[in-house]
A protein has these predicted regions:
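Generic detector of N-terminal low-structure segments
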Residues: 8-14, 18, 33, 37-38, ...
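Intrinsically disordered, low-complexity N-terminal regions enriched in serine/proline/glycine
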Residues: 25, 37, 50-52, 107, ...
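Short, compositionally biased, intrinsically disordered N-terminal export/targeting signals
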Residues: 3-7
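Structured soluble/peripheral alpha/beta segments that form catalytic or ligand/cofactor-binding pockets
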Residues: 60-316
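Short, flexible coil/linker elements and helix-boundary hinge sites characteristic
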Residues: 21-25, 39, 194
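A cross-taxon signal for low-complexity, glycine/charged-rich
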Residues: 2, 15, 19, 23-25, ...
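Residue-level detector of intrinsically disordered, flexible termini
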Residues: 27, 44-47, 73, 117
Length: 316
């Protein structure tokens, strides 16, 4: 996922809504062209296709230079030794996720899960938002109350992939230490089995408007105890809970019952992303010995930072 140039979303939304209002027929290619006409459009998910063929969106070219690496430091220190990770603290999630945290005005919290079936290439991503950073309504509201813009975003990739992202108000949100409920969907951390259970009950968007329902279970091989502050002030934090995991997908669509490799992280912030970042992107790469991750940042002050980390299967 890459995030930047957030103002373009409002322009895109007005054009797309206008086309829907005129009852123009939906065409995935036209929709993709509309998206690609905006530089660094914030949503990277492609329109769903029914032929099983997905073209990879063009990625940005980066200068070839050494990526910092390292494990952790006691404080924020992006030094030449690359020791940027620090012990996770302040949210009660150093050993397991805690969904019952306070998200301040102008802030956000999201929990991200993805998984890939290595043989077919099918994939899924889920993001649970409090203070949805993709929501134009959250921005238009002045970001006064993050709890009033919550959603569970799910995207499936492969034959007849689906996309769902319904913005809901605070009445749809229930926060408990080990369970996050957003409308009819929920994330539950099973303390006994040490696994994350995601119950999905959503409606997918164009072109396949239909009920998207089922259960996705993520079983980490280990939980890390570290986080990466993305700014010196700590206004944005990346918390890689389970870089290595097994995932079981059971959705109410033909051929959408599979297992594969998974991933689980979270991001927390006390300021809007566009206040501090021009651009960021990240990636995770499963290996025999665990998972390697990279993080690339461009701050509003034009400084650039690159990080690379390897996490063993047990989270160390």
């Amino acid at each position: 996922m890459q995030i930047s140039n957030f103002g373009t979303f409002q322009k895109f939304w007005s054009q797309f809504s206008s086309r829907i209002g005129k009852k123009e027929s939906y065409d995935a290619k036209r929709f993709q062209q509309l998206i690609s006409s905006y530089r660094r459009f914030p949503l990277r998910a492609e329109p769903a296709r029914n032929d099983g063929n997905f073209s990879t969106p063009p990625m940005r070219d980066f200068d070839k230079q050494l990526i910092s690496s390292g494990r952790r430091s006691a404080s924020w220190g992006w030094g030449s030794n690359g020791n940027a990770l620090r012990p996770a603290s302040g949210r009660g999630d150093d050993k397991e996720p805690n969904f019952n945290l306070e998200v301040p005005p102008n802030g956000y919290a999201w929990w991200y899960i993805d998984g890939v079936e290595p043989n077919t290439g099918q994939a899924v991503s889920i993001i649970a938002f409090i203070g949805s950073v993709f929501s134009p309504w959250y921005k238009w509201s002045g970001r006064k109350k993050p709890q009033n813009n919550v959603c569970l975003n799910i995207a499936t990739y492969g034959k007849k992939g689906r996309f769902a992202m319904t913005d809901r108000g605070d009445s749809a949100l229930i926060q408990e230490a080990h369970k996050l409920t957003i409308g009819p969907s929920s994330l539950t951390w099973d303390q006994t089995e040490k696994k994350l259970v995601i119950e999905i009950d959503e409606i997918s968007s164009l072109p396949f408007i239909s009920k998207l329902k089922g259960t996705i279970t993520l079983k980490p091989t280990g939980i890390t105890d570290v986080e990466l502050p993305l700014t010196k002030e700590g206004t944005h934090v990346w918390r890689p809970f389970a870089p290595t995991a097994e995932i079981d997908v059971d959705l109410n669509k033909p051929e959408w019952q599979w297992t594969g490799h998974g991933y689980f992280d979270a991001n927390f912030g006390t300021r809007a992303l566009e206040q501090d970042f021009d651009y960021w992107t990240w990636g995770r790469f499963p290996l025999k010995t665990g998972t390697s991750c990279f993080y690339y940042l461009e701050l509003r002050n034009k400084k650039q930072y690159q990080f690379g980390f390897h996490f063993e299967s047990d989270g160390t």
